[in-house]
Swiss-Prot record:
Top-rank taxon, per record: Bacteria
The organism of origin for this protein: Pseudomonas fluorescens (strain Pf0-1)
Keyword Transferase in annotation: yes
Pfam families found in the cross-reference section: Methyltransf_9
Protein name per the record: tRNA U34 carboxymethyltransferase
SUPFAM superfamilies referenced in this protein's UniProt entry, alphabetically: S-adenosyl-L-methionine-dependent methyltransferases (SSF53335)
Gene: cmoB
Amino acid sequence: MIDLSPLARRLAGTPLAEWANTLQVQLDKKMEKGHGDLERWQSALDALPKIQPTEVDLLDGLKLDTNCDDETRAQMRTALMGLSPWRKGPFDLFGVHVDTEWRSDWKWSRVSPHLDLKGKRILDVGCGNGYYMWRMLGAGADSVIGVDPNWLFFCQFQAVQRYLSEPNAWHLPFPFEDLPPNLEGFDTVFSMGVFYHRRSPIEHLLALKDCLVKGGELVLETLVVEGDKHQVLVPEDRYAQMRNVWFLPSVPALELWLRRAGFTDVRCVDVSMTTVDEQRGTEWMKYQSLSDFLDPDDHSKTIEGLPAPMRAVIVAKK
């Protein structure tokens, strides 16, 4: 059982207190339903060695370490490999380098210089395995709550969390839609790599805004295309082999949508092409990756002939 009472205590006296007191029941019900692979992943978690870090670095990466022997490291590696595939990272856990599909540290280095997270209460929507949540804590956040319905990501988060005492980060295996409306309790809300999967992009922006306190900050990272404020790509079918991609606006169009949704001080702080060095297959993620989704003769296009992935980071205030 995952005990959420520390989260309820952390949020006592905040606008999120009432919601926090409902989460244990909601999580327990979700755990009862379970998932077909949950038992296998739980076995991997149970196989993790029972050691404590003497070195913790969440600021310059994600590294936990202590003096341990080769046998312990081998046990750690086998258990972590049992939670494959690992998408977001990398993680350095007691001498085991988890070389994830994504170099998420590169994205964080593009995003974090534009943010002040010290003392902030943060919501990370579509948090994956929680890599960015740990980096947010490293940047001084007061507390971070991530929501993502993927059970494997939930278990990967638990693998790291068990080695950190009172980490002030919680992964809830819920879809964003399960959050109640008008929470208005977070200083900063992140939505990274989620927006283009939404069929109703403006509704997503409004829902994100409802989670923020007045004056709070949204950090939105999503796929974009070149063009003016009227330019939006809607794929006919797949985009980079993904079926669930709906809207890829230009940066000016996205900024317009944010203003229309009621955000102010809207600014684009980064635009970057996604390269096959940043997203690729590894021994920790052995399935297809970006190189398989691009035109083999022209990496400026996807395999469908559409513009290759380009990502923008937009920051805006409520």
